[in-house]
């Protein structure tokens, strides 16, 4: 009887700890920009972009990906950055519709 009670306690303890481990959130890495491009990048070199708005980052930024797979941080307040995002948005829309 003592052995079965001890086994039951061990089983319940193991079950309690395993559910706590499973319930923990998955760690997602945050990408931040600490320096931004100081000059304009040719729109034709750009392939895509991603906005960085995480509160964990020191500043808001846009990461442009070039056709050569380089990633470049830029200040989203600058006019050329806004124009580049608009250019990429329009090109991606045109590409989607022209494939029919």
Swiss-Prot record:
PROSITE patterns: SMALL_CYTOKINES_CC. Residues 1-23 form the signal peptide. InterPro entries: Chemokine_b/g/d (IPR039809), Chemokine_CC_CS (IPR000827), Chemokine_IL8-like_dom (IPR001811), Interleukin_8-like_sf (IPR036048). It comes from the Eukaryota. Disulfide bonds join 32-57, 33-73. It is found in: Secreted. The keyword Glycoprotein applies. The keyword Oxidoreductase does not apply. Pfam families: IL8. Transmembrane segments: none annotated. GO terms for cellular component: extracellular space. Keywords: Chemotaxis, Cytokine, Disulfide bond, Glycoprotein, Inflammatory response, Secreted, Signal. Belongs to the intercrine beta (chemokine CC) family. This is Eotaxin. The lineage of its organism: Eukaryota, Metazoa, Chordata, Craniata, Vertebrata. The gene is CCL11.
């Amino acid at each position: 009887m003592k052995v079965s009670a001890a086994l039951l306690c061990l089983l319940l303890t193991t079950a309690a700890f395993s559910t706590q481990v499973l319930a923990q959130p998955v760690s997602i890495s945050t990408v931040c920009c600490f320096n931004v491009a100081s000059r304009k990048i040719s729109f034709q070199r750009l392939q895509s972009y991603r906005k960085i708005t995480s509160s964990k980052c020191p500043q808001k930024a846009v990461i442009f990906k070039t056709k050569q797979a380089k990633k470049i941080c830029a200040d989203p307040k600058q006019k050329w950055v806004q124009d580049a995002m608009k250019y990429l948005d329009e090109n991606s829309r045109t590409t989607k519709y022209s494939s029919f």
